Each structure stands twice: as structure tokens, then as C-alpha cells.
Amino acid sequence: MDKNSQLRDMNLFRAPAARAAKTLDRSVFAKTLNAAAASISENRLLSKYRKELEKTQEVLFMERFNPILPDPDPSLASQGRKCIVLSPQIKPASPETWSPTLQEASKLGELKVVPYDLEITYDFWNYFDVVKSILPEELHGEIPSGFNTVGHVAHLNIRDQYLPYKNIIAQVLLDKNPHIKTVINKIDNVGSENEFRTFAYEVLGGPDNMNVEVSEAGCIFRFDYSKVYWNSKLDTEHKRITSFFKPGEVVADVMAGIGPFAVPAGKKGVFVWANDKNPESHRYLEDAIQKNKVWEFVKPFNHDGHDFIRTSADLVLEASKRGDCAVIKPPRPPRKSAAPPPEPVRVPVPPTISHFVMNLPASAIEFLHNYRGLYHGHEDLFEPHTETKLPIVHVHCFSAKMDDDTPLKDICERIHKEIGVMLKPGDAEKEGEVLIYDVRDVAPAKRMFCASFRLPREVAFAARA
């Protein structure tokens, strides 16, 4: 079917206008289209005539619509007979509106062109169809569509011009997304109410139930979304960062939240010292550790991030000297096996940290000065005395959205201000360089980045303040 024919049919199926409605009346969206159908004499001919009539552009085309339906004659429909709904230009009583293909098939008795009343209900229309029919035309350009889905909660950020329609927008979202039970609207910026990146919200639809369960990277997280930070749009970034970690290494997650980096890393045998200052995040992190059975590898902390950075290296070194290890129980042998059960595998905690993760983009760079003197007096743990390298720091941050290298320079200067070493954009593995990864848009003029660099020796081994 050519594009003009498709547009012609689709225009007939536009949702009825319900301009400026403030409450949802689903009955408004019911309509009946007086159409025609090809009543097929035998169902085995359905595929043949669908293909032929599509070539002649006589089959009704509409997104989400299957033109093969039960025959309009109840007695034939009860026998399982089907029909093909035809385009509106086909008139049952006017053979001159039929193509030669349709006329010939009718003469052969393989089909009959009959009237067909096509009933369309509210369920047929998608979210955009319904909302467009309600909003004034001048608001069609930026219909609220992008939202975070956290478990059963849809989190909107509705702009001012759409606020008069917020409740009806929420109701349509609930209707068209069965997995969503609650719709909320953010009424302040994340973190503006407190330091834990939570936000004030209003419930637009459904119950005020923020206890959610989400699955990410094969892990289950349960939490109260109103009390902790979670962003489902960061799942790709979580996977990217954890892909750098190797089993048996130690990672210090400074602003761990409820564990989107820590718990998946623990699943792959990485030791994670996971910290968050928010007591609620710490509580749900502990739950995630138990739920996902990663307690051998993930250790939760509830400290201020500044203090955690300064003490983390010493804590890991002490754990290594104590002989701390993860004990991995091997799979049980078959019941009838005569072989003795295998011994548990012990994975020792290494003496040094391989990676630091700092996912607090609004202010994480301001924590970097705490790395000065991190390994003061322990130079012998690293190259050239051993094969161990200093840790890589992954620090998330915001910067301007620009096409040139201005954001990169800005990030390098801010890092320099904190650690006293000027890095240049490049490779995280190379001395004096920093890999600046563009994570995602967060606002029209703002983007989120992740700066990854190996901690410079002059910082790590500096005298402690």
C-alpha cells in the first residue's frame, strides 16, 4: 500500500476530539466506521486474497489493526469464517469502486463484498492518540512521554503548560500501561529538598505506594522510592562501569545508593566496600545484599563519603592482613556420587583497592581532594615494588551540553582544583590522562559525564593532612 493510501485510511481512524477535557470520558472515544469487507468463502483463501487485495490497496490499513476479523454474518462467524476489512473507498453496492481483482474474485464466488460496521473503542487508541485528542493543538509538540519507570511507579516531570491536564495524562498512562499502578509528578529538583537526592512529589494516579521492586543486571532491589535515589535510565552506565571490575578485586563504591554497581559486581565475585550516607539507602543496600546472596563479597557502610574515602584504603589493607576472605561453597555433588564433597573455595581480600566509584554527579568532584595521602607510607604495595597499579577513580559529574571540547576542559579544571594535578582528556590507563565518557542528557543544556583516571602517584602518596 502506498503512503497516500495509508494516510487516507489512518485519517479516518483519528481519535475523536475531546479538547480541553479535565476528566477522562472513555465513551467519547468509541466510534463506528461504516466500511466494507470481503467475506471469504473458505478460510484457506484468506492469505491469498489478503496479499492480492493489499497489492490493489483495498485492504484497510491502520497501525495496531488486523484487517482479518470474524465474518459479520453471525451464522458464518459461528462456523469460524473470516472476512477481510476493506478500505473506505470500497462500496458494497457499487462494483465500480472495486478493482478488477476484487470483481473477478466475486464472480468466482470465492468472496462477497458485504457491509461491515467496524466498532472502535477506547481500548484501540494508544496513549498519544488519546492525549492528542484532549490537549489543545498548540501543546502537541512536547506531549509528556519520557518518564522513569521504577517498578510499578511512573515518574513524570510535567512542564508548566501541561499541568492543567496532569491528572488526565496520568489516567491515560495507567490505562495504556497495565504494569504501571502509580503515576507521580516531581515537584522539585532532585536533591533540592535534601542531600540524599530524594524529591518531593505528588501522586497523579493510582495509590500512593512507593514500595517497589526492580530487576537490573540479574539482581533484585526492593526499596521505598520516596526515600532513596534510583534512576532506571542509568542501567547501561551501571553495566559499563561494572564491566571494568575483575573477580577478586576490591572496589570502593563511595556513593553506593542501594547498590546498582555494588550488588551486580558482587555477583561476579568482586569485593565491594559499598558506602552511602543515607540511612535508608544503607538499609535497602543490606536487603539487596541478602536478597541477592552476595554477602561474601559486598560489605555495606553508612559513612560520610569524605570520611569513607580517607579510611577505605586502610580498612581494606587491615582486612587483607587479617586474612579476610570470601568462602564460596561448591555445587553439591549428585546424591549417588561416591566422591567426597569438594572443599569450599576461599577467595582472599587483596591488600589494595582497584577502583573507586563516585556516582554523585552534582558534587562528586568536590570529594576528590580526600584521595591525597590515600596510600601514604604504603608505596611498597604498588609498582615498581609489585605489579599492582594505583586505583582508577570513576567520578560522575555534570557539565554543559556543547559540541566543542568546552565540557572536557571544564571537567579537567575542576579535577585539577581538587587534586592539584592537571589531567588531559585521553586514556584512563595512561599517566596524566583522563577518559571522559559522555553518559547521557539530563536537561536541554546539561549532560552527565563520567571521568575515569588512574590516581596520580603524587596524590596517592602525598602526606596526609
Curated annotation (Swiss-Prot):
MF term (GO), any: tRNA (guanine(37)-N1)-methyltransferase activity
Gene Ontology CC terms, in alphabetical order: mitochondrial matrix; nucleus
Primary enzyme class: transferase
Transit peptide location on this chain: 1-20
Gene3D superfamilies xref list: Met-10+ protein-like domains, Vaccinia Virus protein VP39
Record-linked SUPFAM superfamilies: S-adenosyl-L-methionine-dependent methyltransferases (SSF53335)
EC number: 2.1.1.228
Self-association state and partner proteins as the record states: Monomer.
Protein name as it appears in the record: tRNA (guanine(37)-N(1))-methyltransferase
